[in-house]
Amino acid sequence: VGDLMLDRYSWGKVHRISPEAPIPVLQVAQDDQRLGGAGNVMMNLSALGAEVLACGVTGKDEAGEIVLGLLQEQEIDTSGVSQHQEYTTVLKHRMIAGHTHLLRMDVDPPPENEVPQEGLIHYLKKTVPMVDAVLVSDYGKGLLGNSVLQNIAAMGKTHNIPVLCDPRRNTN
């Protein structure tokens, strides 16, 4: 359960400085897209042989479609991933020349954009009793508020299922 993201990488070389501003011009030679955030954790668990059921939210946007496709390529069950028109999929785009990170562009949902959670709790209530463990991967993007976290902890306790946390935010 967690914040699904897309990590995009553009690799290339810098041969000149832009005439519009004193910034390097990256001549892109290769692009790559990978699962980020909770998706990366899910992919790693799947690679270790775990049966992974993904639970999270993406937007109905290009990045969201790519995240779903990458999860499915890893044979990760995506029935717990909901897509919403009003939500923006988190995207981290890194631009790299040689071994130097030139820039990272972040596309995050606006702060006032509430993360749709209605299907999340419903999916967890029917799924938690059937799993061996729940891994919560919180990158602070709004999906896992206190109410959701309390619900997950209570479900784990009720069904004697371990709940493991991978927080990227202050958990006080």
Q: What function would you assign to each model-found segment?
A:
Residues P22-A29:
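Divalent-cation-assisted or electrostatically stabilized phosphate/pyrophosphate-binding catalytic cores
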Residues V1-H15, Q30-N172:
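Ribokinase/PfkB-type carbohydrate-kinase core domain
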Residues R16-E20:
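Flexible glycine/proline-rich, aromatic-decorated loop/lid segments
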